[in-house]
Design a protein with these regions (language model features):
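The AdoMet/dcAdoMet-binding core of the Class I SAM-like
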Residues: 1-137, 141-143, 153
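Soluble small-group transferase modules, centered on the S-adenosyl donor enzyme superfamily
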Residues: 1-14, 56, 70-79, 98, ...
Length: 248
């Protein structure tokens, strides 16, 4: 979805290696010249190699670059901008992760998005309450001029957001032309996606719908770390965010 939102992207960055499948999928775009994947734990790359060949591009594609560093520290030390930044950190109850869902982080990360670029933020809707989940949405709502919310799993969400950078801030349609390329089609088939319309059907909300509610909702901040304070509790009580499930 991120690649099809910004089909002309040349430079991309991803926060969080995980299994390597997201990086592999992004590298399916033949228009992308470089993808930097930032992972704080080097052992994740060791584990990810067990998933070959379905993530081969991460380790074998010359356009792929793995950086072992804290995401905030990495961005603070570079002078570069990316056509998109995809943030797929661990679950918010993992120590330190909640700081990647704050107003301050979104303020900072915007500096590294090229004009016309986007941020794609993944967050899960399981083991988290509606109240806490909406603190993340409210933080992002404060800092981005437009965004779309896609339901990408039974309880997983991808928020694709555009900052107000002087360029037209409205998000355009997903690009069917890029999806038609051989590697992208193959990647789609692995995920059970045969057509862009299937991805468009995952769209459940946008800023116009959510802003009136989020404008008055508490936002997750460094000084008011609602997510850090409540994520472990929500996990313990097996909380589940239900509000967005009603948006179809």
């Amino acid at each position: 979805i991120t690649a099809l939102t910004r089909p002309d992207a040349k430079q991309g960055a991803l926060i969080g290696l995980g299994s390597g499948l997201t990086s592999h999928a992004l590298l399916a775009s033949d228009r992308l010249e470089s993808l930097t994947t930032i992972e704080i734990e080097p052992e994740m790359a060791v584990a990810a190699r067990h998933f070959t060949p379905v993530n081969d591009r991460v380790f074998k594609d010359d356009r792929s670059r793995l950086i072992y560093d804290d995401a905030k520290a990495y961005f603070a030390g570079i002078d570069a901008r990316y056509d998109y930044i995809v943030s797929v950190p661990s679950n918010p109850w993992v120590s330190g992760v909640s700081s990647l869902f704050t107003v301050e982080f979104y303020q900072e990360v915007k500096r590294y998005i090229a004009p016309g670029g986007v941020l794609a933020q993944w967050i899960q809707g399981y083991e988290i309450s509606d109240r806490l989940l909406m603190t993340v949405f409210a933080a992002l709502d404060r800092e981005f001029a437009d965004y779309r919310v896609y339901r990408v799993g039974s309880r997983d969400y991808l928020i694709v957001a555009r900052p107000d950078d002087g360029e037209p801030s409205k998000l355009g349609p997903l690009d069917a032309g890029l999806f038609a390329s051989a590697d992208m089609r193959e990647q789609g088939e692995l995920l059970g996606v045969a057509d862009v319309s299937q991805l468009e059907a995952m769209l459940i909300a946008n800023r116009k719908m959510l802003h009136p509610f989020l404008a008055t909702h508490p936002a997750n901040q460094d000084a008011r770390p609602y997510l850090d304070d409540g994520a472990e509790r929500d996990r313990f009580f097996r909380a589940s965010a239900e509000m967005l499930l009603a948006l179809r």
